[in-house]
């Protein structure tokens, strides 16, 4: 294929495209392979449960007119649509709420976009489980490094949304690997991903978790699949979108460090730094619930005991969860709910009616949520302190390493139990157990199409 640009190809673009080109053939370290399967299971469970939430229902309805026009499954339905459409619908379901995984350093939710994007192309190409696992791990590597290389500062000051940029490039890279593109074709995929790059963080004002689901999951998955599919169809592109005049970093970089995009590829696997949520709520609330439930368990605290609650959390994410109108991302509501019920479940965290429950509101009125700069720089990140004053005394818990993060990972049993709890109401417990077992041995699956009977509902 003839080059379409006279700009010399940078060493970064050359090395990165070669790495992506070889990814589907490159064995992963055993620990990386195992953890990737955990994130695939967690993401598929999030998509299945999200298929019954508003964002998931709307995504499926949007692509439903294309039923029968393509090979890719819309999870939780019987629809079969073009890959780009399946990626969009499944991506929106994957972030239909706050069940899906996250990556703290990369500041994005990788699984809700990369897992369905790679699945759509794997179904199209009839690709097996082992290659699929490698492509997903690659997507996490590229997505996280992309936002790190752009050098954004705090989440509350960034003008571009890392939660939209990273999924698009991660999904595009995964697709390029599954298509087994040459390095030149990979660079063309990255060029189309760069042209589609977008995302403004006013998703923080979304009150229905629909646009947010598109921004975090559906858009990046769709655009990544489209970027790879266009090159598969023969589209040519600029040879190096990472250097030269008007490149990715000059357009989106805040304090760009392009070298971060290729840093320690094949040595540091970003999926090992990704987190699986114990609680199906916004990431900044994980530590708050860890601390609250610990106090309930350790001291038998009930709603009747509470006189005052003080929650201290990092100031850079305070705005994301302070008195929000959606139950699963409102810190005050979830803390109060946990105390009233003695814990929380997926169902209670998504029950809008409980936001008007008089018992919950009574406890919530006693809560003060405080931003703290020291907790923002504390490591491990996203710590929280909950202090509860009762008639029996004052009790305090400082949650440092959030459950499900690399510093305090969930066990395989916990991850599989979470997934089963999420999918059983949709596909039944028996098929849920089959899905868990299939992902446990995913590298032996001859074709990702073989998962279809376990993902329809």
Model regions: which residues?
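Active-site-proximal alpha-helical scaffold in enzymes
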Residues: 116-128, 166-184, 216-236
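Acidic/polar active-site rim loop that often engages polyanionic ligands
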Residues: 169-171, 204-209
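Terminal-appendage/accessory-domain detector
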Residues: 1-107, 208-225, 229-457
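Short helix-coil transition sites and intra-membrane helix breaks within transmembrane domains
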Residues: 104-111, 160-165, 200
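Flexible glycine/proline-rich, aromatic-decorated loop/lid segments
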Residues: 192-201
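Structural helix-adjacent loops and short alpha-helical linkers that scaffold large soluble proteins
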Residues: 124-136, 180-187, 237-240, 300, ...
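Aromatic-lined, polymer-binding surfaces characteristic
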Residues: 142-169, 217
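Hydrophobic alpha-helical hairpins/lids featuring a short glycine-rich hinge
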Residues: 93-150
């Amino acid at each position: 294929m003839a080059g379409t640009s006279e700009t010399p190809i940078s060493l970064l673009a050359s090395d990165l495209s070669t790495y992506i080109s070889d990814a589907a053939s490159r064995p992963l370290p055993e620990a990386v392979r195992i953890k990737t399967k955990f994130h695939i299971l967690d993401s598929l469970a999030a998509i299945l449960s999200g298929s019954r939430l508003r964002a998931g229902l709307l995504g499926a309805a949007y692509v439903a007119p294309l039923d029968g026009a393509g090979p890719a499954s819309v999870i939780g339905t019987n629809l079969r649509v073009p890959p780009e459409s399946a990626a969009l619908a499944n991506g929106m379901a994957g972030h239909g709420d706050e069940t899906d995984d996250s990556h703290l350093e990369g500041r994005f939710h990788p699984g809700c976009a990369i897992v369905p994007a790679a699945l759509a192309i794997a179904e199209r190409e009839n690709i097996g489980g082992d290659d699929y696992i490698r492509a997903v791990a690659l997507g996490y590597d590229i997505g996280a490094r992309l936002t790190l290389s752009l050098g954004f500062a705090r989440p509350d000051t960034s003008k571009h949304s890392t939660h939209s940029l990273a999924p698009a490039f991660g999904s595009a890279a995964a697709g390029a690997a599954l298509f087994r593109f040459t390095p030149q074709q990979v660079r063309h995929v990255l060029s189309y991903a760069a042209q589609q790059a977008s995302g403004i963080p006013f998703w923080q004002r979304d009150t229905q978790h629909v646009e947010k689901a598109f921004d975090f999951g559906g858009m990046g998955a769709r655009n990544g699949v489209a970027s790879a599919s266009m090159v598969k169809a023969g589209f040519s592109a600029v040879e190096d979108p990472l250097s030269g005049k008007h490149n990715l970093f000059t357009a989106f970089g805040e304090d760009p460090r392009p070298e971060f995009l290729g840093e320690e590829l094949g040595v540091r696997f970003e999926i090992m730094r990704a987190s699986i949520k114990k609680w199906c709520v916004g990431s900044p609330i994980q530590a708050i619930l860890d601390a609250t439930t610990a106090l309930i368990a350790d001291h038998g605290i009930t709603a009747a005991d509470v006189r005052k609650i003080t929650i201290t959390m990092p100031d850079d994410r305070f705005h994301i969860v302070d008195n929000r109108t959606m139950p699963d991302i409102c810190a005050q509501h979830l803390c109060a709910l946990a105390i009233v019920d003695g814990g929380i479940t997926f169902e209670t965290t998504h029950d809008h009616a409980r936001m008007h429950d008089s018992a919950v509101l009574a406890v919530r009125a006693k809560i003060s949520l405080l931003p703290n700069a020291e907790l923002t720089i504390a490591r491990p990140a996203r710590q929280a302190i909950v202090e509860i004053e009762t008639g029996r005394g004052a009790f305090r818990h400082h949650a440092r390493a959030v459950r499900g993060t690399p510093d305090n990972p969930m066990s395989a049993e916990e991850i599989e139990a979470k997934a089963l709890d999420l999918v059983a109401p949709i596909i039944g417990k028996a098929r849920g157990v089959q899905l868990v077992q299939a992902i446990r041995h995913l590298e032996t699956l001859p074709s990702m199409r073989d998962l279809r009977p376990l993902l329809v509902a």
